[in-house]
Amino acid sequence: MKVKEEDKSLWCSSLGLNIRSLRQATNVREQLCSLTEKHHIPVVTDPSLSSMERKRNIKRCLCQGFFMQSAIYDRDGFYLTAKEAQRARIHPSSSVTTPCHWVIYNELVETSGSFIRTVTQVEGKWLAETAPDYFYLTSFPEGRMKQELIHLYQELLL
């Protein structure tokens, strides 16, 4: 049975889901499935992992590809992008509605202000472990981001 586009949009809205992001996720999934088939890579799911562990693993994988597009919560609903320290808000179309300490994002857009889109909450330590050369302290100017990284590295050493 084919579902009307309008019905899909209404269903997503009723659940607080972003239809654009779901389409993008479906497209990425189809591409990954196609690549695994093409290269004869078996797709294995560990049945012993809980749903929470699988989500964590997916987020850690996303950190591998998006560490350069990370940001930390600043204040008043704004985030600071990692290297540029540009202040931006989470785009209103995002399903992330509560402040998260660290996030990764797919794009930074300039409209009536600066917004980050396709946002995922992550842990700072995942970013530091994934890309230690990128998050090397001497490459950051003095400021909020550097202070957060110092605090993060101190926690990792404990």
For the regions a protein language model found, what residue spans apply to each?
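Second RecA-like catalytic domain
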Residues: 1-154
